[in-house]
């Protein structure tokens, strides 16, 4: 795999400037210790850096968009398709597929929160994936790892791949016609940038419209 990929997150999630400011991994511990003296919320912003082995950590411009996916694992008890208590960078080469995937998950969260109607602003992140090799399961469409809503089998595969130090999994989307990636090691990604803002319009259980916000640009 060697291509640009798109990931969509809530726009309220900020850049973690500490990752951006470190150019040498050896400087991380010192800078973190100094910053934490004056910023009591630093741990919440940075997440659990121990979840990312030192050899896989990335720093510098755009690094926060990558690292946040790994230092902030799921907290809802359900997790993602291939992970439950560790982080994965879910993304797609086709922005439309990334929108379909994130729309499904935002709608499910809002339904379970018993919200009838709302809007949510989202941020599109574009990054470079690879060159790297991922575990390819696109041919296993009849397997239980593709169950629409139950992730047990897929998460078992995710744990096995993580234990084997795999760079991740290449799989078919079940929300749209297209393919997705679940990246398990941060150093497989680079050059992450804010791409644009979207507004998801949610009504009675579904995302009914996706609006590209005027002036958001592509940068």
Predicted regions and their residues:
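Active-site and NAD+-binding cores of ADP-ribose-processing enzymes
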Residues: 1-82, 93, 107-219
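Short, well-ordered beta-strand elements within core beta-sheets of diverse protein domains
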Residues: 86-92
